[in-house]
């Protein structure tokens, strides 16, 4: 069975791993997925990730981040732009997610970045997902 939305699959695996209190989660890797993981790591939502090769397929293994009392660093992670309905936004139209406590991850002409970085560079793009 082929997958139509690989990014949504990655986000679902991360969400389910946090709900199950897992330490690590792995899934097939791609350029867009590693770009999203870079943003999540830079913003402090995950500890680290490593890409490995097994049987000519690259996998990403993500080390999830929890607080001292065991709370997940990601409460919500949702896909915004889907294959059937792409969502594009100018940076001025994006308001802060959860009063600037969460982030939007955008795919811009300058690469994948958070809405905070996009505000600094004054560039909009496709809204991939939102994280809180």
From Swiss-Prot:
One of its GO terms (biological process) is translation. Keywords: Ribonucleoprotein, Ribosomal protein, RNA-binding, rRNA-binding. GO terms for molecular function: rRNA binding; structural constituent of ribosome. GO terms for cellular component: ribonucleoprotein complex; ribosome. PROSITE patterns: RIBOSOMAL_S8. It comes from the Bacteria. The keyword Transmembrane helix does not apply. SUPFAM superfamilies: Ribosomal protein S8. Belongs to the universal ribosomal protein uS8 family. Part of the 30S ribosomal subunit. Contacts proteins S5 and S12. One of the primary rRNA binding proteins, it binds directly to 16S rRNA central domain where it helps coordinate assembly of the platform of the 30S subunit. PANTHER family: 40S RIBOSOMAL PROTEIN S15A (PTHR11758). This is Small ribosomal subunit protein uS8. It comes from Rickettsia akari (strain Hartford).
């Amino acid at each position: 069975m082929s997958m139509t939305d690989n990014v949504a699959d990655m986000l679902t695996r991360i969400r389910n791993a946090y709900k199950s209190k897992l330490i690590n989660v792995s899934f097939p890797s791609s350029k867009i997925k590693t770009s999203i993981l870079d943003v999540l790591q830079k913003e402090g939502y995950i500890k680290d990730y490593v890409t490995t090769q097994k049987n000519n397929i690259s996998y990403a293994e993500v080390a999830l981040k929890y607080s001292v009392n065991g709370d997940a660093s990601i409460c919500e992670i949702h896909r915004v732009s889907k294959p059937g309905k792409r969502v594009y936004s100018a940076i001025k139209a994006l308001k802060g997610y959860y009063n600037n406590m969460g982030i939007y991850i955008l795919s811009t002409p300058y690469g994948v970045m958070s809405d905070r970085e996009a505000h600094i560079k004054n560039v909009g793009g496709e809204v991939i997902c939102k994280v809180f």
